[in-house]
Amino acid sequence: MDSRPIGVFDSGVGGLTVLKRLVEVLPGEDYIYFGDTKRVPYGDRSEEEIKKFAKQILNFMREQKVKAVVIACNTTCAVINKSEYDVVLFDVLKAGAESAALYTINKKIGVIATTRTVESKSYEKNIKIIDKNIEVYQKACPEFVPLIEKGLYNSPIAYETASKCLKELKEKDIDTLVLGCTHYPLMASVIEEIMGENVKIVDPAIKLAYDVKDYLLKKDLLNPQIRGKAEFFVSGDKDNFIKTAEMLLGEKIENVLHVDIEKY
């Protein structure tokens, strides 16, 4: 048994979709969530910047004495080398690739993600490790994250933007679509409506949450309490973060603390 918290981080509010799944699967755990709201979005930043940000955030997480860290940001997963860090890391991108390879029947998978994640070809590489015969079609949708951070994920402009971005993938006869950015599940209803009922929408956070549970069980690191708590930290704007967190998690978020992450 281990009562230390689990760390979860993302560039902003997107990782809250991962936290929600973790709480559903592991309700007894305590969580430390960090959203880098000052520097969001990560998708168009350089690899060097993202690596620097990840190092700062993981230093912060070490200070919080976490037992593991969930990288709830596909862009970060796509560029960092996990072996460089001495903390247990869980990778949302790998979980998404494994889920998609499992679900596809016609072996045609679409991936929507940030520009940096698409350019890295990380999803394609991870999927083809599982099955080299799967065709992977990737599409960058950089307009999604700014809309979601502003709370406009179910708005008419979100539908219009998603329709344009998904048009190319709709023509590829895919049967599976990976939401390759943790912000995107907030637009899942819009995306599902556009893609139609014959396309399976994959939220990587579902498998990821069970991967974390399996690890904690295997290592005897589960928190013995019945109901845990979550603490929230941000580097910038709190207002939209709190609004989205309360909507997703279904509870009042009283205490969101500001962190000067650049000092780490």
Curated annotation (Swiss-Prot):
The keyword Cell wall biogenesis/degradation applies. It catalyses: L-glutamate = D-glutamate. Pathway: Cell wall biogenesis; peptidoglycan biosynthesis. Keywords: Cell shape, Cell wall biogenesis/degradation, Isomerase, Peptidoglycan synthesis. Its EC number is 5.1.1.3. The active site is at 73 (proton donor/acceptor), 181 (proton donor/acceptor). GO terms for biological process: cell wall organization; peptidoglycan biosynthetic process; regulation of cell shape. GO terms for molecular function: glutamate racemase activity. SUPFAM superfamilies: Aspartate/glutamate racemase (SSF53681). Pfam families: Asp_Glu_race. InterPro entries: Asp/Glu/hydantoin_racemase, Asp/Glu_race, Asp/Glu_racemase_AS_2, Glu_race. Belongs to the aspartate/glutamate racemases family. PANTHER family: GLUTAMATE RACEMASE (PTHR21198:SF2). Provides the (R)-glutamate required for cell wall biosynthesis. This is Glutamate racemase. It comes from Thermoanaerobacter pseudethanolicus (strain ATCC 33223 / 39E) (Clostridium thermohydrosulfuricum).
